[in-house]
Design a protein with these regions (language model features):
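Alpha-helical DNA-contacting segments of helix-turn-helix folds
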Residues: 20, 53-62, 70, 97-100, ...
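HTH DNA-binding helix-turn interface
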Residues: 22-25, 38, 45-55
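Amphipathic alpha-helical linker/stalk segments
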Residues: 56, 60-82, 118-128
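Append "Primarily bacterial transcriptional regulators
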Residues: 28-35, 44
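Basic, helix-initiating cap at the start of DNA-binding domains
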Residues: 1-23, 31-32, 53-56
Length: 184
């Protein structure tokens, strides 16, 4: 008779997610997770075919949290909010940021989701409505590159000016640089 499962799938995901946030994705193994749950690895494998399946669930959950950050209103400027959310996520949830963007778990889908959020937000800005689609794509790609770089530096602890105002000023520098896109 098989042993009764003592942890639900959701409980295992929650404990693993706590580990992800504090220790990072690479620290999550069946053995380390079982130790945190005060059990053997058997209950984990009772719900997940492999640790990779569990880790995929964790990255999916981290991506959802990332998307929540980029839709918040940090300023009165919709275009700035998504970028600020990106960098604030990297600052506040550096291990989640690393799991989503720096460990090979990032794919085109998350970039497209981010792009969709940005485009829906910036459409609220009257100036953006005048910009041609080709320029919008160009602007998005440049902003993505800059913001992803700033977020990475922040998550790694290399960007020292990472207060909300510091992030805002860094991103405003980029917006000022690209301001001519809106003016043409």
């Amino acid at each position: 008779m098989p042993k009764k499962v003592i942890y639900t799938r959701e409980e295992i995901i929650e404990k693993a997610y706590e580990m992800l946030k504090s220790e990072g994705l690479n620290q999550i193994t069946a053995r380390t997770l079982a130790k945190k749950l005060k059990t053997s690895p058997a209950p984990i494998y009772g719900h997940f075919d492999s640790m990779e399946v569990l880790k995929d669930e964790l990255v999916k959950k981290a991506r959802e949290q990332f998307l929540n950050y980029i839709i918040k209103n940090y300023t009165e400027k919709p275009f700035l909010n998504a970028g600020m959310g990106f960098v604030i996520f990297a600052r506040e949830e550096s291990e989640l940021f690393r799991a989503v963007f720096l460990m090979g778990n990032s794919d085109k889908e998350i970039i497209l989701e981010f792009k969709d959020v940005i485009f829906s937000e910036v459409e609220k800005d009257e100036r953006f409505k005048k910009v041609e689609e080709e320029k919008k794509e160009w602007l998005f790609n440049k902003c993505w590159t800059y913001t992803h770089g700033l977020a990475t530096l922040t998550a790694m602890g290399w960007e020292k000016n990472n207060s909300n105002d510091g992030i805002k000023n860094n991103l405003l520098d980029l917006i000022v640089f690209f301001n001519d896109v809106f003016e043409k």
